[in-house]
Amino acid sequence: MLLVECNVLEKVEVINEGTGTATRLRLRGKFQQCDEQNNNGRIYPRSILESQVKAIQEKIGDRSLVGALDHPANDAIHLSQASHVITGLSIDKDGSVMGECEILSTPNGQIVQALINDGVKIGISSRGVGSVTEGIKGKIVNEDF
């Protein structure tokens, strides 16, 4: 089953780097929360998110973990849809999954930058394939995620 999560980045730190036309827009904020029911009624155990964050560090390091402007219908991102690249991802002691991304100069990245410049609150979403088990507090994402 394709699991899609979307969180509005409530407290986003916007960082403009560089000068003139060479500026880069970076966003930092809370991407997800461990062990709490999210907006879609799912709970991601910390152990699962820790293993996923660890598994994608190489992609983050070589700048190949790109994201799209809109939700793709499946778990694949096509480079023609890219709007940002994830540049950092970690889990705090309180279980907050904190992330950083750089907005790309692609057409979709330019749309994201325009939305941010116009004061629109944007969200961040994650996708993955896995199963869930019905729990007392919500649907718990299983180890096959």
Residues of each region from the PLM?
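Short conserved beta-strand and strand-loop elements enriched in small hydrophobics
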Residues: 61-77, 124
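Residue microenvironments linked to proteolytic maturation
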Residues: 87-145
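A structural detector for beta-sheet-dominated domains
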Residues: 15, 28-32, 68-70, 80, ...
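Polar/acidic, low-complexity leader/linker segments enriched in S/T/G and N/D
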Residues: 1-60
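A residue-level signal for beta-strand positions that form part of recognition/binding surfaces
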Residues: 24-28, 64-66, 96, 123
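Short loop/turn segments at secondary-structure transitions that flank enzyme active sites
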Residues: 33-37, 73, 105, 130-132
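Low-complexity, polar-biased intrinsically disordered regions enriched in Pro/Ser/Thr/Gly
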Residues: 15-18, 43, 77-79, 112-114, ...
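Short beta-strand and beta-hairpin "edge-sheet" elements
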Residues: 3-13, 74-98, 139-145
